[in-house]
Structure formats: C-alpha cells, structure tokens
Amino acid sequence: MVKKSLRQFTLMATATVTLLLGSVPLYAQTADVQQKLAELERQSGGRLGVALINTADNSQILYRADERFAMCSTSKVMAAAAVLKKSESEPNLLNQRVEIKKSDLVNYNPIAEKHVNGTMSLAELSAAALQYSDNVAMNKLIAHVGGPASVTAFARQLGDETFRLDRTEPTLNTAIPGDPRDTTSPRAMAQTLRNLTLGKALGDSQRAQLVTWMKGNTTGAASIQAGLPASWVVGDKTGSGGYGTTNDIAVIWPKDRAPLILVTYFTQPQPKAESRRDVLASAAKIVTDGL
C-alpha cells in the first residue's frame, strides 16, 4: 500500500512538472543548467557564482549562490540606493552639491576628474558611479551616508544579512581569496537587487531613478548583456578587481515577459589574472536559454 501510494505520488509529481515545463521535467532542466555552469567554471579555471530569479513565478537558478564573492563595483548600487533612501525624507538631497578636489582622485575617475575644483550634485555623482563606475563618485556617496558601515547598515535595514562594505575605493577591490571584506553572496545580492529595483525597498520615484541610472550603464555591453537576445532590456552594474574578479548584476526585461534578476560573480586564483567578461556572458546565456 505504501509503495503504491509513493509510486502514485511520484507519477503525479512528474506529470505536473511535465505539464508546466513541456516534455523535459524540471529536475532534468535544473541538472542540465548546473552541469553547463560547472563546465563553464571548469573551462574558465576560476570560481563562478550565479543567482537568477524569474519574477514570473519566483523560480531560481543558483550556482555557488551562498558562497562569498568580492563585490567590487557592484557595491555601488547599494551606495547609490542608500542615498536615494535618504532622499525620501530630504526632497532636495539629490541637488546638493559636493566639492571635488584634486586630492579626491584615485585610480579611475572618468567623470569626477572633469570637475576638479568644482562641484557635482549627489544625482550627478550617483549617475557617474552607476553608469561609468567612477570611483571618486562612489567615495563621495559612501561619505555622504556616513561611511562603509552605514552602507552595510542600510543593507541590514533591507533584510540583507550577508552584504558587507568595509572599505572605500579603490581598496575595496582587492578581492583576496578568503577575505570576507567587501563581499556578499549571489543569492543575497539577487534578492536585494530585486527589492531595490522591483520591490518596495525604495519609494516609487527613487526606485524609478535607480532603474533609470542602471539602464543607462555604459560598462556592461560585454558582460551579462552579451549573452542575452538583443531585444531584451538590461539595467546593470559591473565590477572588477584583483584576482581577475569580474562581476555583473542586472535587472533584465525580456520582451513581453516578467523581469529577471541575474547576479554573476567570477574570480580566479592568480592575483593578476585578466578580467573574463566572456564568462559572465556565457553564464547569462546558459541560465536564460529556454526561458
């Protein structure tokens, strides 16, 4: 009797999955994706972390999703969001001007260096950080909200217990293997990115502004976006650092479909390894094929 009931349950479950997904059961699809990601990781010689959330049904694809990875410049999304959150109670905050000094310049300042001895608004700094990955802009955002610990505190307010920002630019990009500083997990970042861009973590206008900034990113064409159909709309934030660390986090709007959230983190064992945006593009293609 028990064996018969168990067999009936198994047949019913398999039939349900087949009806939902066609002729290939869910477990087979998931296993196939996992195998492809594992092979991509093996061929790349690094460590790959992936988290995909399909908001149509809340299904997920996860690969090393709870391991820590250095965020590098993907952390700029959280810093900009912290400023946007503050602006909810200070309506004119984004227009506030911030002085840019020559002593502020660090290793990568494509926008801020044009404003030395002048000022930039917090809105301009946020756009520079998110769309051009300007490191001076990131440091100004961090300073405005009270330092790295305050950005981490903002993440905690969102329910993210994994994110941690410990340093400023450019030292937050060292990405030393095993170093927990300035890290998160793919799963945690995916959920937080969903809350910020599609959920209620920010007010309506602040959320719309964050999405607009991310859609205007100029650094992501060779990363996640390169693995997606050209008709899909992408808003993303890339990051790179030591040990060939190459990252991209994205909100994706497939044509006539519910949005996707995709986080791809990749790092390598060699301190001076080259960035591998192609790995992120391949991972994006693997997890979105068939959607």
UniProtKB/Swiss-Prot annotation:
- Please name the GO terms that the record assigns under molecular function: beta-lactamase activity
Q: Which InterPro entries match?
A: Beta-lactam/transpept-like, Beta-lactam_cat, Beta-lactam_class-A, Beta-lactam_class-A_AS
| Record's note on what induces expression | Expression may be regulated by promoter elements associated with upstream probable transposase tnpA.
User: Can you tell me where the transmembrane regions are?
Assistant: none
Which UniProt keywords are listed?
Antibiotic resistance, Hydrolase, Secreted, Signal
Q: In the UniProt record, does the keyword Signal occur?
A: yes
Top EC category: hydrolase
Q: Explain the regulation of its activity.
A: Inhibited by the beta-lactamase-blocking agents clavulanic acid and avibactam, via a covalent binding to Ser-73.
Secretion signal, residue range per the UniProt entry = 1-28
> Any one cellular component term from GO for this entry?
extracellular region
Give EC number(s), comma-separated: 3.5.2.6
Mutagenesis / variant outcome for changing residue 170 to L: Slightly decreases resistance to ceftazidime in TOP10 strain. Abolishes resistance to cefotaxime and aztreonam in TOP10 strain. No effect on avibactam inhibition
Work out whether the entry's keyword set contains Cytoplasm. no
Coiled-coil annotated spans: none
The family database entries (NCBIfam families) matched by this protein are listed as: bla_class_A, blaCTX-M
- Describe the task this protein carries out: Extended-spectrum beta-lactamase (ESBL) which confers resistance to penicillins, as well as first, second, third and fourth-generation cephalosporins. Has cefotaxime- and ceftazidime-hydrolyzing activity. Inactive against the carbapenem antibiotics, imipenem, meropenem and ertapenem.
Q: What subunit structure does UniProt give?
A: Monomer.
Xref: PANTHER family = BETA-LACTAMASE, BETA-LACTAMASE-TYPE TRANSPEPTIDASE FOLD CONTAINING PROTEIN
Its family? Belongs to the class-A beta-lactamase family.
What other remark does the UniProt record contain for this protein? The class A beta-lactamase family has a specific amino-acid numbering system, sometimes called Ambler or ABL numbering and often misspelt as Amber. A multiple sequence alignment was used to derive a consensus sequence and then the consensus was numbered taking into account insertions and deletions. This allows use of identical numbers, e.g. for active site residues, despite differences in protein length. UniProt always uses natural numbering of residues, hence there appear to be differences in numbering between this entry and some papers.
Q: What is this protein called?
A: Beta-lactamase CTX-M-15
Q: Which organism is it from?
A: Escherichia coli O25b:H4
Q: What is the lineage of its organism?
A: Bacteria, Pseudomonadati, Pseudomonadota, Gammaproteobacteria, Enterobacterales
Query: Gene encoding it?
Result: bla
